[in-house]
Every structure is written in structure tokens, then in C-alpha cells.
Amino acid sequence: MKKLFILAVLMLAVATTQAQKHHGVYAIGFYNLENLFDYTHDEGKKDEDFLPTGRYQWNQTKYEWKLRNLSRVLSEMGTEVLPKQGCAVIGVAEVENDHCMSDLVAQEPLKKRGYRYVHIEGPDHRGIDCALIYNPKLFKVDDAKLLPYIYDLPADSLRATRGFLAVTGTLAKDRVTVIV
């Protein structure tokens, strides 16, 4: 499913660049990090399950293992089409905080590609956010903001949840906004 999504995005990118007479192909990806939590408590967040004494007995060893595996997978995204480059941007979901993102891009596979990230702490009571990983050689960030999720029914809006991260920047001389 993820490969089909990347292929569809690549085909769209090629069609867009062809129509605008720009030449170049850029991979854009998305990955659900599936609860990338560190093992320390964030005040005001319901992250107790991901503490050493919590439900998952989350600890440094498990955290570092997950970081290594995620960084390998993320660094390989887009390389079937662009082996030396990989993805220009990768939207990610279910990350706890800025600390987790910093630790993730510091892993050797992502560090070698020079990836950076954009993360804005959201209102989700569980501490689950979205972020954007990007290659600064390919994508220049101009602006980032968190857009709230608007519920259809007022009764549903009593629960704070993660919003959408909107990052605007330049890719291949075109201004683009990526929403995660």
C-alpha cells in the first residue's frame, strides 16, 4: 500500500513537472510512526503507557530499537526511483514530541541524507502529533502552522485531538504546501 502511494505521488509529481516545463522528479512520502514515544513523561500529556512502569514497559532499549528501524525504513523511501536522493519530504504521523523527532533524524541513515524536520506541538491529550521530515537541499521551508481539526458535530469538539501540520515551502522552484 505504501509503495502504491509513493508511486502515485511520483506519477503526479512527474505529470506536474512536465506540465510546468520543469524537469526533475521528486519523491514525496508518508509514514505512520505508530506511536513513536520516548520513555519520559511529558507534563500534561497522557503518555503513561509509554513509560518504563507503564503498560508497554517502554524503555531506552525499546525506544532506540524503534528509532533505528524507523530511520532505516524512512531513509529507503523513494530510493527505488531515486536511489541517491530518496524522498524530498516525508510526512509522519503519531510522534510524541520534538525530542522524538530530533532523535529520529539524528539516526545515521537519516543523518547521512541531511534530513531535518518540522514539528509543532499539538493539543492532543495523548501527546500524538504529526511532523514533516525534509531534505533541505530539495525543499526550503518558508512557513509552518498547525491547522485545527474541525468536528462536524459540536458535541464531538469537547475532545482535543491532533490537527494538521501545514508546511509551505519551495520544491523545484515551485511554491508548495504539504499538509500532514
Regions found by a protein language model. Name each.
Residues 1-23:
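Bacterial Sec-dependent N-terminal signal peptides
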Residues 11, 35, 137:
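Short, glycine/serine-rich, charged loops/turns that create anion-binding
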Residues 19-108, 118-128:
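N-terminal, active-site-proximal structural segment of metallo-dependent hydrolase catalytic domains
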Residues 27-35, 143-145, 175-180:
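Active-site-proximal beta-strand elements of phosphoester/diester hydrolases
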Residues 42-44, 172-179:
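Metal-dependent phosphoester/phosphodiester hydrolase catalytic core
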Residues 95-175:
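Structured beta-strand-rich core segments of catalytic domains in phosphoester-bond hydrolases
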